[in-house]
Every structure is written in structure tokens, then in C-alpha cells.
Design a protein with these regions (language model features):
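Amphipathic alpha-helical interaction motifs in eukaryotic regulatory proteins
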Residues: 14, 29-33, 40, 57-64, ...
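Eukaryotic basic, amphipathic alpha-helical target segments in cytosolic regions
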Residues: 21, 32, 36, 60, ...
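Intrinsically disordered, low-complexity regions enriched in proline, serine, glycine
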Residues: 23-25, 40-43, 50, 77-79, ...
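Amphipathic helical hotspot of TIR/SEFIR-family domains
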Residues: 58, 62, 69-119
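C-terminal interaction surface of TIR/SEFIR-family domains
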Residues: 1-11, 22-26, 106-153
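Structured beta-strand/turn binding interfaces of compact recognition modules in eukaryotic regulators
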Residues: 14-18, 35, 40-44, 49, ...
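Conserved N-terminal substructure of TIR/SEFIR domains
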Residues: 1-65
Length: 153
């Protein structure tokens, strides 16, 4: 579907693998692809503490939409936070449509940066002080977008 326009992918999926890979993400990816929607889903286990891989940044740039699946451990991953910051940049600069899914977390936890989100950002502050402000802003921004709240417990 995306091949006829400037977009290589219709949808970029941003998620924390340990929380969602074998449940919601696989189901969502399968359902979208069955309908002819080209998705980008990174299948590698990403290590924290490194910059976002260039191919992920490029895939975000080449995607028309982003689905951000915010889960309990999403903010503990610097990779996820870097993806989110890039997605929010694309939303602001290119009009990318962003759909947040709050998976087993409340939107208010993301918006107010409480619970696991606060704990993760406090930990990141020790090593990535210069980036944490941007990550906080990105989390606040995505939490203000109307999305879906999915509770699977």
C-alpha cells in the first residue's frame, strides 16, 4: 500500500519487546499485514544504552503512521525513548499521524510520569542527563494524543 507514495511503510510499530512482542504486537502486525498495510516491526532484541540504530531512524522517517505501544517497561528502554522522540519530531515536522496504545498502563501514568515511567527516567538521568528532558517531553506529548487503553490482566 505504501509503495505508491513517498512512504516506504504505512505503519511503524514502536514497542518494548519484553512486554508486548508475543502478544499485542504480533497480533497487530499480522492483522495489519493481512489487510495489505505495510508495517515496520523491529524483530531484534535491542540493548539499552546505545543510540538508535540508523535503520530504525530511517524506517520512522519513511513511515506515514506510527503506533506507539506504551507498556509498563517502555520507558526503561533508551531505544524506545529515542524512537518515540524521533516519532514526535516527525509528527511535528512532517505531520506523521501517531496512535498511542496504552497497554496495561494508564494514560495518566505516562502524562504525569508516575510509576514505572518515573522510575525509569530517574535511572536514565544518571547516564543520559542531556537526553532525559527530550524523552520526558516526548512522553508528555504522546500521552496527550487520544489513543486506546488496553488492559490485558
Amino acid at each position: 500500500m505504501a509503495s505508491t507514495s513517498q512512504w516506504k511503510y504505512d505503519v511503524f510499530l514502536s514497542f518494548r519487546g519484553e512486554d508486548t512482542r508475543n502478544t499485542l504486537v504480533d497480533f497487530l502486525n499480522y492483522a495489519l499485514q493481512r489487510r495489505g498495510i505495510d508495517t515496520f516491526k523491529d524483530d531484534e532484541k535491542l540493548e539499552g544504552g546505545k543510540i538508535i540504530k540508523p535503520e530504525l531512524s530511517k524506517a520512522i522517517d519513511e513511515s506515514r503512521f506510527a503506533v506507539v505501544i506504551l507498556s509498563e517497561n517502555y520507558a526503561s528502554s533508551t531505544w524506545c525513548l529515542e524512537e518515540l522522540a524521533k516519532i514526535i519530531d516527525c509528527k511535528k515536522e512532517k505531520g506523521m499521524t501517531v496512535l498511542p496504545i496504552f497497554y496495561n498502563v494508564y494514560p495518566s501514568d505516562v502524562r504525569k510520569l508516575t510509576g514505572t515511567f518515573a522510575k525509569a527516567l530517574d535511572e536514565h538521568e544518571k547516564l543520559f542527563k542531556e537526553k532525559v528532558g527530550r524523552w520526558r517531553d516526548s512522553l508528555n506529548h504522546v500521552a496527550d494524543i487520544v489513543g486506546y487503553h488496553v488492559k490485558n490482566r
